[in-house]
């Protein structure tokens, strides 16, 4: 039976290898592989441009350096702008909030080596989806902190929020005392009046502005952190005996 020369040197195609990495949960290897490939391509391009610059005129050297700088800057701007087109919650599920909160210093923040610029929009999308699943509870905590800070900066909004809570507690007390459950029409009318009063109170005291500012800041922090945060091993792979 005839075999091709050196059959053991057959390699797995890159798409199949990357698909296996995704299915196995080793996305940090794929992230590292993408960053390494981008760094190798950038270094080879810089070496070739420097070699060409030694044999070119000074004007050509300046133009080539300027063109390379603007091309790199444009590529980075395209990558950053692609973060705005990503739906970060497409792969998020309720189970991601049921686990333990990732440690803030070692897991969520990390060190300086834990961050790098994404080499492409595909890598940025992969990082955002995976990091949001891993740090879902951390991002939720950040939103609560930002919302509390916004309420602290806007005392009227805090008064409006507390007033709306007090209004619904009063409605619950009156409902239990006067037995609104026995009168469905009266209960619906009371709920409608309470909803209108709550909406007017929250709008008049600018609670929606505090909520919007907290959402905007927390969303920006989440997207930037998830896009620039390298994928770290969530669990160690098991080795066969």
Curated annotation (Swiss-Prot):
Membrane topology label: Multi-pass membrane protein
Residues passing through the membrane, by range: 142-162, 189-205, 209-228
Pfam families (alphabetical): PRA1
GO BP term, pick one: vesicle-mediated transport
Compartment(s) of residence: Endoplasmic reticulum membrane
Main localization category: endoplasmic reticulum
GO cellular component: endoplasmic reticulum; endoplasmic reticulum membrane
Keywords: Endoplasmic reticulum, Membrane, Transmembrane, Transmembrane helix, Transport
Origin: domain of life: Eukaryota
InterPro entries on file: Prenylated_rab_accept_PRA1
Function: May be involved in both secretory and endocytic intracellular trafficking in the endosomal/prevacuolar compartments.
Family listed: Belongs to the PRA1 family.
Protein name: PRA1 family protein H
Organism phylogeny: Eukaryota, Viridiplantae, Streptophyta, Embryophyta, Tracheophyta
């Amino acid at each position: 039976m005839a075999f091709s020369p050196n059959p053991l040197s057959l390699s797995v195609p890159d798409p199949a290898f990357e698909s296996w990495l995704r299915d196995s949960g080793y996305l940090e290897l794929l992230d590292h592989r993408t960053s390494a490939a981008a760094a190798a391509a950038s270094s080879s391009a810089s070496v070739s441009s420097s070699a060409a610059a030694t044999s070119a005129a000074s004007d050509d050297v300046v133009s080539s350096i300027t063109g390379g700088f603007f091309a790199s800057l444009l590529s980075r701007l395209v990558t950053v702008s692609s973060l705005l087109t990503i739906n970060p919650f497409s792969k998020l599920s309720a189970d991601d909030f049921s686990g333990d909160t990732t440690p803030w210093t070692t897991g969520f923040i990390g060190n300086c080596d834990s961050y790098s610029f994404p080499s492409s929009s595909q890598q940025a999308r992969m990082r955002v989806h995976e990091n949001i699943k891993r740090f879902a509870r951390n991002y939720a905590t950040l939103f609560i902190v930002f919302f509390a800070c916004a309420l602290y900066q806007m005392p009227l909004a805090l008064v409006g929020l507390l007033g709306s809570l007090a209004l619904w507690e009063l409605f619950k007390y009156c409902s239990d005392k006067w037995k609104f459950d026995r009168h469905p029409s009266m209960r619906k009318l009371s709920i409608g009046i309470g909803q209108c009063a709550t909406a007017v109170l929250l709008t008049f005291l600018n609670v929606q502005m505090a909520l919007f500012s907290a959402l905007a800041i927390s969303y920006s922090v989440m997207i930037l952190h998830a896009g620039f945060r390298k994928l770290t091993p969530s669990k160690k792979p098991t080795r066969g005996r």
